[in-house]
Amino acid sequence: MTQNIHQDRILILDFGSQYTQLLARRVREIGVYCELWAWDVSEAQIRDFNPSGIILSGGPESTTEAGSPRAPEYVFQAGVPVLGVCYGMQTMAMQLGGRVESSTEREFGYAKVEVTAPGRLFDGIQDALSADGNAVLDVWMSHGDKVTAIPSDFTTVASTETCPYAIMANEAKRFYGVQFHPEVTHTHQGQHMLQRFVLEICGCAALWTPATIIEDAVVRMREQIGDDEVILGLSGGVDSSVTALLLHRAIGKRLTCVFVDNGLLRLNEAEQVMDMFGDRFGLNIIHVNAEARFLSALSGIADPEAKRKTIGRVFVEVFDEEAAKLPQVKWLAQGTIYPDVIESAASATGKAHVIKSHHNVGGLPEEMKLGLVEPLKELFKDEVRKIGLELGLPYDMLYRHPFPGPGLGVRVLGEVKKEYCDLLRRADAIFIEELHKADLYNKVSQAFTVFLPVRSVGVMGDGRKYDWVVSLRAVETIDFMTAHWAHLPYDFLGRVSNRIINEVNGISRVVYDISGKPPATIEWE
């Protein structure tokens, strides 16, 4: 009998912080299951979830403003430990009888917190000692408002020069508030603090590991699917690849994968996918070469969004045709991951700002009447990668730089043609190969080549040629929300440019994109 890896669980209420998903990932890294819900959940929902502890996230709003978010009253009546982070601390203080005010001195960035009283959350955790012999913590602050009076049954545990209540605690009720962000790496002991809260104060067992997640997923899929057959669109990307191997472990040959080669993949990618999953792992794969069909559909289309929608529509058509040949299939598998679920929930409640147009199997016709299998829907991307390693997928494949769903369709600017894709594939392969050779690939967050539909004069030997231009793009980023262009060495860029121009007949000029995000986006389209 498998362990119930969901038995100990943390509930994180989201007040809108940019770090909230990071907070959830940190709890998962400790080995404990958690879920992320909007702040305005009902008492019944919390009771039904039955958390071992609750964390209130940070957020961009001010508790001093009318109508600002509040934690449900039941949070403080449930009898479980509660940790308030930044805004979460402020709403905890205000709701339990303290006071919060807007501060003239805002704190953004590094700060030193001096611990002046004992407390379970921080005992024995420190970065340094003060002149008075107190523990000092290096933390990351990001707040304008601050608590100016704590609830009467709380004690002050720590402060900074400008924040008198940096940590507050009610040990009897196991309520804690921290004005800083323990989830970010800039708070050096942050993970240690979260570990103390989750494992010791909440009493959770660390059951959430790659091996136990795989075991749990296999059991649940077998229960869900029974003796039926399943179809999966396999792209060779991380999510669909891990989904395929999990399903294969659960139901073996009753899984049929459909790999659609749209002609917009990287150099030799189709062959690599078939070798990896067909030959090495023994999956049942239908390989559909639909390059001509996709390129025909894209003919004459230059608008990026129109290209995306066309690629998505044709994929659905091709996949639907293949699925229709398999009437015995009763289930459709998808590589939906937890951030997709969070995004969809936010969209449904009207709390999301921008929802990307996805071009996956989610648009399949309703008449297919297939049940849905989503074995990754509880997992963050980093967890999916760890499970992939546990299942035997190569590190280099799982940790490749991001590749857009529409593939080269959005890296060829303007109209997409086979000639352009073939040139771009070869140029990009040279760039990536040289990054690996120079040990630079893992030092940048994303690197790729873009095809520009303009010709430039070049000189080869004694003659002139009028050929195409490509741009190299490499960025460094933590969250892909903002990014800096990577300062690659000049001699490296020169070597890449020289190889592309000499080895890829049809390209006469190579440029390097030095735009940051913002104002530019990482991808050109």
Curated annotation (Swiss-Prot):
<comment type="subunit">
    <text>Homodimer.</text>
</comment>
<dbReference type="InterPro" id="IPR001674">
    <property type="entry name" value="GMP_synth_C"/>
</dbReference>
<dbReference type="GO" id="GO:0003921">
    <property type="term" value="F:GMP synthase activity"/>
</dbReference>
<comment type="function">
    <text>Catalyzes the synthesis of GMP from XMP.</text>
</comment>
<dbReference type="InterPro" id="IPR014729">
    <property type="entry name" value="Rossmann-like_a/b/a_fold"/>
</dbReference>
<keyword id="KW-0067">ATP-binding</keyword>
<keyword id="KW-0547">Nucleotide-binding</keyword>
<dbReference type="InterPro" id="IPR004739">
    <property type="entry name" value="GMP_synth_GATase"/>
</dbReference>
<feature type="binding site">
    <location>
        <begin position="235"/>
        <end position="241"/>
    </location>
    <ligand>
        <name>ATP</name>
    </ligand>
</feature>
<dbReference type="InterPro" id="IPR025777">
    <property type="entry name" value="GMPS_ATP_PPase_dom"/>
</dbReference>
<keyword id="KW-0315">Glutamine amidotransferase</keyword>
<dbReference type="Pfam" id="PF00117">
    <property type="entry name" value="GATase"/>
</dbReference>
<dbReference type="InterPro" id="IPR029062">
    <property type="entry name" value="Class_I_gatase-like"/>
</dbReference>
<dbReference type="GO" id="GO:0005829">
    <property type="term" value="C:cytosol"/>
</dbReference>
<comment type="pathway">
    <text>Purine metabolism; GMP biosynthesis; GMP from XMP (L-Gln route): step 1/1.</text>
</comment>
<feature type="active site">
    <location>
        <position position="181"/>
    </location>
</feature>
<feature type="domain" description="GMPS ATP-PPase">
    <location>
        <begin position="208"/>
        <end position="400"/>
    </location>
</feature>
<feature type="active site" description="Nucleophile">
    <location>
        <position position="86"/>
    </location>
</feature>
<dbReference type="Pfam" id="PF02540">
    <property type="entry name" value="NAD_synthase"/>
</dbReference>
<feature type="domain" description="Glutamine amidotransferase type-1">
    <location>
        <begin position="9"/>
        <end position="207"/>
    </location>
</feature>
<keyword id="KW-0436">Ligase</keyword>
<dbReference type="Pfam" id="PF00958">
    <property type="entry name" value="GMP_synt_C"/>
</dbReference>
<dbReference type="InterPro" id="IPR022955">
    <property type="entry name" value="GMP_synthase"/>
</dbReference>
<dbReference type="InterPro" id="IPR017926">
    <property type="entry name" value="GATASE"/>
</dbReference>
<protein>
    <recommendedName>
        <fullName>GMP synthase [glutamine-hydrolyzing]</fullName>
        <ecNumber>6.3.5.2</ecNumber>
    </recommendedName>
</protein>
<dbReference type="InterPro" id="IPR022310">
    <property type="entry name" value="NAD/GMP_synthase"/>
</dbReference>
<dbReference type="GO" id="GO:0005524">
    <property type="term" value="F:ATP binding"/>
</dbReference>
<keyword id="KW-0332">GMP biosynthesis</keyword>
<feature type="active site">
    <location>
        <position position="183"/>
    </location>
</feature>
<keyword id="KW-0658">Purine biosynthesis</keyword>
